[in-house]
């Protein structure tokens, strides 16, 4: 869907993935990151080897719109809506669900107008007591984040 807004698929930068170069200052681009806020124990198991934890946090999709484009603000709003709609009312097959999705307009930077799309997420996982096994998600699928076109992997 983003290709219909700006004429190309904007570059997407991911948290924890080093890029060899800075984004092109004349192009729209996005940065996706998460922040885990809580990992609370939500249920005691009758068997002490497993306990349920609920993890919650925030997904951020930061959208950068080049000031050199006369329609940057308009296109930024449209790109933000695509990102918002990718999360609004959605959950993954792995039981990660999203809520309270919103668009925040931020102060501009030197080269870019900026928008933040923020989605709260939540999922459950089972923690094994054995140290070598670590955490085992209730579902095998980890949180899934926004990708182009408002769909999930």
Question: Where on the chain are the PLM-derived regions?
Answer:
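Histidine-centered catalytic/metal-coordination loop motif
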Residues: 46-47, 51, 89
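Mid-chain, well-packed structural core segment of small domains
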Residues: 58-84
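Acidic-leaning, charged glycine-interspersed low-complexity segments
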Residues: 78-132
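Oligomerization/assembly interface segments of phage tail-like spikes and tubes
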Residues: 51-67, 113-125
């Amino acid at each position: 869907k983003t290709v219909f807004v700006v004429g190309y698929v904007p570059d997407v930068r991911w948290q924890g993935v080093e890029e060899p170069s800075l984004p092109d200052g004349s192009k729209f681009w996005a940065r996706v990151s998460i922040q885990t806020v809580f990992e609370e124990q939500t249920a005691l198991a009758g068997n002490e080897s497993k306990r349920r934890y609920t993890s919650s946090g925030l997904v951020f999709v930061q959208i950068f719109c080049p000031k050199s484009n006369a329609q940057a603000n308009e296109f930024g709003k449209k790109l933000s809506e695509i990102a918002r709609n990718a999360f609004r009312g959605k959950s993954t097959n792995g039981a990660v669900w999203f809520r309270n999705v919103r668009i925040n307009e931020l102060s501009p930077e030197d080269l870019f107008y900026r928008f933040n799309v923020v989605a709260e997420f939540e999922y459950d996982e089972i923690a094994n007591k054995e140290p070598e096994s670590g955490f085992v998600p209730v579902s095998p699928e980890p949180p899934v984040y926004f990708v182009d076109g408002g769909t999930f992997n």
